[in-house]
Amino acid sequence: MFFQDIIQNLNKFWSEEGCLIMQPYDTEKGAGTMNPHTFLRAIGPEPWSVAYAEPCRRPTDGRFGDNPNRAQHYFQYQVIIKPSPDRIQEKYLSSLEFLGINPKEHDIRFVEDNWESPTLGAWGVGWEVWLDGMEVTQFTYFQQCGGVDCNPIPIEITYGLERIATFLQDKESIWDLDWNKDFNYSDIWLQFEKNQCEFNFRASNPENMRKLFSIYQEEAVSLLDKKLTFPALDFVLKCSHCFNLLDARGVISVTDRAQYIEKIRKLAREVASSWIIERESLKFPLLKK
């Protein structure tokens, strides 16, 4: 199955399960959880069901395209359903079957692995899903996002698209994956990966990144004062990416790391609180759906 067909098939499967099919969010982020369709919609009483593919950037994970299974830019497929439905594990297994993976013919294990994002003030309980010895999915019941308790509890299912594709296509390297019948993964992403790694590890200006972090932090605070939740979240995500770039350059001390994380977490919590206040002022309109 081609890489693009995996996404299309997951879209079809989860659409038929009642999920909105959304598009990626247009700001750098380290995980699909940072998309407002997850980070904001996971909190508050309103129901929500959404699925989307999300490109993610983790600068420190880059290896200039030399590692067969590791890259600073990759794709997740994110599913959020609130409240979590009954028999969600069975639905997940059905989604694998929809991709051509028969659970009866493979060793599929749910391995306990609770999840936490310190910068987002988010955590949950759940499992890694292992397929014939390879982790392919994270399965999490969110407990908090932005320091706000989740009630009702949503389920987050995060598929590692490259890992699933290497399994389906029997490839040893993500760079050899067939995107479609004419192009492989490296045709599209290898030059991008090399360029971005050069920037992440060598070419970025740490002093400018520090300045940008301060500017983005100041802008986020200003936007929160104006009760503009979505733009504020954009600048929190920019702060997070600046922090990750500084981390990739190796210029953050242990003390600095803790301080940067606390600054981002504080902003994320304020964004989450702002979201709840804003939705409450609208009388939580999705409760009427």
UniProtKB/Swiss-Prot annotation:
It is an enzyme of class 6 (ligase). Its main location: cytoplasm. It comes from the Bacteria. Keywords: Aminoacyl-tRNA synthetase, ATP-binding, Cytoplasm, Ligase, Nucleotide-binding, Protein biosynthesis. It catalyses: tRNA(Gly) + glycine + ATP = glycyl-tRNA(Gly) + AMP + diphosphate. GO terms for molecular function: ATP binding; glycine-tRNA ligase activity. It is found in: Cytoplasm. Its EC number is 6.1.1.14. The keyword Ligase applies. Belongs to the class-II aminoacyl-tRNA synthetase family. HAMAP family: Gly_tRNA_synth_alpha. Tetramer of two alpha and two beta subunits. This is Glycine--tRNA ligase alpha subunit. It comes from Prochlorococcus marinus (strain MIT 9515). The gene is glyQ.
